[in-house]
Structures are given as structure tokens and as C-alpha cells.
């Protein structure tokens, strides 16, 4: 199967910090940067009980079926699915702190 490289945008909310362990909840995943920024701004304007939000751009190398699953079912995927990502580059784009 052919592999592709795509930029995927994640919005993650920091739920808990204990020492070097950070627990995050993924709030949004999309391949459209503009849409990700709009959702990030909307979520950042709301008051939450978290430590903050981060909008990150991941450059990922994978087969088309991997991207399909990631973009369509991101909220229901097991943690092991994310551990298999081949990340080419990571870049935080925006961050809020509580």
C-alpha cells in the first residue's frame, strides 16, 4: 500500500499533570488548518477546569486508510492507534494556560 504525508491538526486539552506525566484529552482532529484554528478559538474562549489547550500540527506519514480512520473516528480510537503514528514533524501552533 502506498503511504502519504499529510498535515493533521489536533486540539488537545491538558486534564492532569502529575510529575512528568501529562494526561490530555483530544478535543478535535482535522486536516483543515483554518477549521482547526476556528474551533481552537471557540474552545479557548470557554471557561474549563483544565490546565489549558494546545493546537498542534503533526506531519504524519501513513497509508490512506490510516488517515481515513484518524479523521472519521478519532474520538473512538484506542490509545494504541495513536502510538502507531509515524510523525515526521510536530509543531505547536497555539496554546492557552488556565
Predicted feature locations:
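Intrinsically disordered, low-complexity peptide-like regions
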Residues: 5, 14, 28-30, 87, ...
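Short aromatic-glycine-(Arg/Gly/Cys) micro-motifs in beta-strand/loop hairpins
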Residues: 2-25
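A short, charged, amphipathic alpha-helix used as a generic interaction element across diverse proteins
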Residues: 21-22, 29-54
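Intrinsic structural disorder/low-complexity segments
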Residues: 15-16, 36, 72, 94
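Short, mixed-charge low-complexity intrinsically disordered segments
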Residues: 42-98
Amino acid at each position: 500500500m502506498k503511504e502519504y504525508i499529510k498535515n493533521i491538526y489536533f486540539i488537545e486539552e491538558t486534564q492532569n499533570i502529575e510529575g512528568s506525566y501529562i494526561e490530555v484529552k483530544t478535543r478535535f482532529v482535522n486536516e483543515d488548518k483554518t477549521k482547526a484554528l476556528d474551533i481552537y478559538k471557540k474552545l479557548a474562549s470557554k471557561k474549563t477546569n483544565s490546565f489549558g489547550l494546545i493546537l498542534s500540527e503533526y506531519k504524519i506519514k501513513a497509508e490512506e486508510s490510516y488517515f481515513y480512520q484518524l479523521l472519521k473516528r478519532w474520538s473512538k480510537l484506542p490509545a494504541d492507534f495513536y502510538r502507531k503514528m509515524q510523525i515526521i514533524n510536530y509543531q505547536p501552533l497555539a496554546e492557552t494556560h488556565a
